[in-house]
Amino acid sequence: MGRMNVSMMRYLEGDHFRVLIAVEMGMKNHEVVPLALVSAIAGIHRGGVARTLNDLCKHSLVAFERSKKFDGYRLTIRGYDYLALRALCSREVVGSVGNQIGIGKESDVYVGGDPELNDLCLKFHRLGRTSFRKIKEKRDYHKKRKSASWLYLSRLAAAKEFAFLKALQERGFPVPKAVDVCRHLVVMQLVVGQTLCNVTHVEDAGALYDRLMALIVKMARHGVIHGDFNEFNLIMLEDERIVMIDFPQMVSIDHPNAEYYFDRDVTCVRTFFKRKFDYESEDWPKFDEVERKGNMDVLLEASGFTKKMALDLNKAYDEGDFLAHCEQELRNRQEEDLGEDEDDSDDSKSMEDIQEEPEDLEKDHEELQAQENTVKQQKIVLSQTTRFTDWLSDATNQLEAVDLDALKSEEGYKDIELPPEDFKRPADSENDDENDEDEEEGEEEDADGHVAVEEQVAKVVKKKRVPSGARSVASSAATFTAEDVKRRLALDRKRNKEKIRLKVKGKQSAVGRNRKDNKDVIAEYAGWI
């Protein structure tokens, strides 16, 4: 961990930041922004923009990228940091940047200060690192977009975390005070303490365990689940008070996997206390026992809470039913409890009215469509597997039904003879036959010239038999003709020459290619006028 090099900010002029903002605006719909577009957005002459971009490239605030078709400039993460710090300095929110105090798969954390030298915490979101690139699976920043740049996703993550910080702070949760946000930078209060994973001793482990479990339940009652509630995202102060950090993965309790995330948070706390403090409690919260008290997930549009679900929930709230957010099983249980109580008969009627609504009002249309597609795919795979098993069973039954005796009775059928155990190569068969004949003659002499007819027949069959296999193993490989090899080598040389010819050289390579194309067009239509 080190310091962020912000010394160049004091030497940058207004035109430098003007060009940086122009590149940022051009990257909304361009992967690389051409020089002409940067000049048009910045409102500066192309020559002045080119000189300014050269200065910015020297300090790695922008990067020039060349390709086969397009050349242009791209904003780097350092340039994005400078733009965020410049805006916050102009608002008089940030006055200095200090050492780095934390690093993660999604962000970097630095110590900072305001113009009055009060300590602040600066969190720079860094989405797109190689250690965490499955953003579309793990986070909902994309929503329905097919693609987006890492800088834009970092900006969305910062805005989402700032919104969660403000909402949790207003409801009395122990979180750092949110100060301001700009692009991918979140400014918050600096919390002086140590993470729970580094704590070695507490006065009362049971009381701390109860406070953490109560905090999980309190968040669930307000409609959200932390999703990553572990010892690395909890800071303990000197008086053993707990402060929560890191909220980009918070989900709604109406998320399809809400119970899994809730149980995972509870399991993380129980496992940590058993391992660290040798404390294990028999009581822990259950997801089915949570009763909603607020709708913070609706206000913040947490993951898993769709607009249609929000409309249905608001409609139920207007009718006076505060249990419409629960799942179907929880509704059935509460209906039974309400049915037993005669005084709550009106509430049970309202619950039945809500249950009679169609399912498409309770679930998102996209989720239902996805479920139908998965069911169809499973049916297709199942039909293919059953078809194969049926064919295999029919084939085995047919093989078992074959009558070998009937085949033997047919003409042309001969017994299949296996090679003997001491079978050798055909090249050595003549020598072996001579040795066998000598041995057989000796045996005949020993037996006084009396040889059985069966032995003579076996001897004739052995000599006439053709070996059905060989002991040696030969490897086979595909061979190429000389003409084929020459043709392939010539093709490789041609491709290498084309690669060298297409190699981009110089900053104005795209301009040169366009001019060459224009010359060809002019030469083609020469003399027409």
UniProtKB/Swiss-Prot annotation:
GO terms for molecular function: ATP binding; metal ion binding; protein kinase activity; protein serine kinase activity; protein serine/threonine kinase activity. It catalyses: L-seryl-[protein] + ATP = O-phospho-L-seryl-[protein] + ADP + H(+); L-threonyl-[protein] + ATP = O-phospho-L-threonyl-[protein] + ADP + H(+). Expressed in pharynx (metacorpus and posterior bulbus). Expression is restricted to adult stage. GO terms for biological process: maturation of SSU-rRNA; nematode larval development. The keyword ATP-binding applies. The active site is at residue 228. GO terms for cellular component: cytosol; nucleus; preribosome, small subunit precursor. ATP binds at residue 123. Disruption phenotype: RNAi-mediated knockdown causes early larval arrest. In adults, results in no obvious phenotype. InterPro entries: Kinase-like_dom_sf, Rio2, RIO2_wHTH_N, RIO_dom, RIO_kinase, RIO_kinase_CS, WH-like_DNA-bd_sf, WH_DNA-bd_sf. Residues 411-428 have a biased composition (Basic and acidic residues). Required for larval development. This is Serine/threonine-protein kinase RIO2. The gene is riok-2.
